[in-house]
């Protein structure tokens, strides 16, 4: 809560206690009620009066008028609030721009504003995200999960949580048996030098196609061969384990290169192969204890009481399922890492699965399950429809990277080819590319489907990551053009233009927005705030010139303002996983 919100709550509590003796009104009664008006012309803050109606026994709009009249007496030249008005059932408060600037700019300038939230000690949180499968290509559809999880890790860390970013790589399963079956029996190609994991994904697609097209005895033969490979892998047959380890490493090297390019890291990586047998033993022991039951030779748990049906945990042939391994994985998270909150960033199609997993963990006695949360997200599709590794209609990472870098170097950096070094051109193109991809994956709520369009996402105007980094670079360029040093000791009262005040208000709201983005699992809130912030800067740039300011004092004040806008934008971009270049 900032000084203005605190003042609103303190004054309102005093007035309510004067007019209502039926209870004691405390500041904490409505510190969560203070909000931002839908229209900035209405004021800087709003307080709805609906929750006061029951106690005061009169309509909210009447309460708003009465409170506004009494609150006027608190306003003076020394107070941060300069206007209080009743509008319908709301109280609208206007803040002094000079006081707002004096409060926020020095703290942003010295960096204190961005360190205060992380001083709050909160619980340990594990955020599990990405979860790619080896022996399959990493494609553009995987980027949404990566962008969501990485941003949440950064946001939770900023908000003071002890964050463990985790990956859970699918390195066992039927898809691997199919891939190795085709690789061993039908492949005639030499593995490429780079992105061999993607190449394995192509073999997997060929395997699926060959299996789907087979009929009769041939299909039975193929299925039997694949089943035998699966059994040999589970039995740790030396020949197939060596093939599995070699090809698995190809995929892991692909993933490592992709994460480095995207500037994404993990504190811990789990592998399905590591929890496979452990999950089996958990289920067997659970059956002995009466937690789980046999059903037609398989083992599962009856979740009818939770209206979640029968949840199978172990197949009748003894083979494990995703559910088997998820129980072992959760146990590791709780026992080995001591997490108090566990977040799973996984596609919306797994919603029922996670409801069943969490219900099963609760039956097993894990109280932490109440703080387990599945963050579902909708698909990323192409303009022609849904992507599928099985069908092979995906944009693979290597193709995406090549095409997006070529487009950026041609359309955005072409004029710098003669003057910039090759290294700077490549690094700048990579930063713009990552900004375009990550912002495109984050600027909508996770339940909204995304249509991927590289051309649209690379436009330097409008709601794109490219626009955001352009705004940042532009601000830095403006500040470099001014020969004077940026200082915090300025006349804050000179920052009186409405467009300057909008920027101040956005900076003042920054930490609140970041906190809400974490608690609501919605990085989209921060992404959209950064877009609005960048638009507000463009308006201020056109109306509040730094270079052509009327006086040196005004130039110093605006230079500080624009410098702080750049610092806030930089911090916000970092929290959604974007590192902007310093020039473009």
Protein language model annotation of sequence segments:
Residues 1-101, 110, 116-584:
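Non-catalytic interaction-recognition regions
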Residues 105-106:
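Beta-lactamase-like hydrolase cores
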């Amino acid at each position: 809560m900032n000084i203005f919100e605190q003042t609103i709550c303190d004054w309102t509590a005093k007035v309510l206690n004067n007019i209502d003796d039926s209870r004691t009104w405390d500041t904490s009664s409505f510190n969560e009620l203070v909000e931002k008006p839908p229209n900035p012309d209405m004021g800087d803050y709003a307080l709805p009066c609906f929750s006061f109606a029951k106690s005061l026994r009169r309509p909210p709009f009447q309460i708003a008028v009465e409170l506004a009249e009494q609150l006027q007496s608190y306003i003076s030249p020394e107070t941060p609030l300069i206007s209080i008005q009743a509008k319908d059932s709301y109280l609208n408060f206007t803040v002094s721009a000079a006081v707002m600037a004096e409060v926020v700019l020095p703290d942003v300038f010295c960096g204190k504003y961005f360190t205060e939230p992380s001083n709050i000690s909160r619980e340990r949180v594990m955020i599990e995200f990405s979860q790619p499968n080896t022996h399959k290509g990493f494609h553009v559809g995987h980027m949404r999960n990566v962008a969501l999880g990485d941003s949440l890790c950064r946001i939770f860390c900023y908000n003071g949580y002890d964050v463990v970013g985790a990956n859970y790589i699918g390195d066992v399963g039927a898809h691997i048996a199919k891939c190795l079956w085709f690789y061993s029996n039908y492949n005639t190609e030499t593995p490429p030098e780079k992105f061999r994991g993607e190449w394995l994904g192509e073999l997997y697609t060929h395997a699926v196609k060959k299996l789907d097209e087979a009929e009769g005895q041939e299909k039975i033969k193929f299925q039997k061969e694949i089943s035998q490979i699966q059994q040999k892998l589970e039995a740790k047959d030396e020949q197939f384990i060596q093939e599995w380890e070699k090809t698995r490493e190809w995929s892991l090297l692909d993933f490592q290169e992709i994460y480095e390019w995207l500037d994404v890291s993990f504190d811990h990586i789990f592998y399905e192969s590591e929890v496979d047998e452990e999950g089996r033993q958990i289920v067997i022991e659970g059956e002995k204890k009466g937690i789980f039951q046999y059903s037609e030779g398989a083992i599962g748990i009856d979740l009818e009481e939770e209206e979640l049906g029968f949840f199978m945990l172990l197949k009748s042939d003894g083979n494990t399922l995703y559910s088997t391994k998820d129980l072992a994985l959760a146990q590791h998270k709780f026992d080995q890492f001591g997490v108090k909150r566990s977040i799973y960033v996984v596609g919306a199609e797994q919603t029922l699965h996670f409801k069943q997993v969490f219900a099963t963990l609760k039956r097993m006695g894990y109280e932490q399950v109440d703080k387990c949360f599945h963050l579902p997200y909708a698909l990323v599709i192409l303009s022609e429809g849904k992507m599928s590794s099985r069908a092979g209609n995906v944009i693979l990472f290597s193709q995406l990277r090549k095409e997006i870098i070529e487009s950026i170097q041609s359309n955005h950096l072409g004029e710098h080819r003669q003057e910039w070094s090759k290294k700077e051109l490549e690094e700048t193109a990579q930063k713009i590319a990552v900004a375009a991809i990550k912002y495109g994956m984050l600027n909508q709520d996770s339940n909204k489907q995304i249509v991927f369009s590289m051309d649209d996402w690379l436009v330097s105007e409008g709601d794109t990551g490219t626009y955001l980094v352009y705004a940042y670079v532009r601000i830095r360029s403006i500040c470099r053009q001014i020969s004077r040093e940026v200082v915090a000791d300025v006349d804050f009262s000179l920052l009186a233009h409405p467009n300057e005040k909008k920027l101040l208000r956005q900076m003042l709201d920054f930490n609140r927005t970041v906190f809400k983005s974490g608690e609501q699992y919605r990085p989209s809130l921060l992404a959209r705030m950064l877009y609005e912030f960048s638009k507000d800067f463009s308006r201020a740039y056109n109306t509040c010139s730094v270079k052509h300011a009327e006086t040196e004092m005004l130039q110093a004040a605006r230079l500080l303002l624009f410098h702080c806008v750049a610092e806030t934008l930089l911090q916000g971009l970092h929290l959604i996983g974007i590192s902007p270049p310093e020039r473009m």
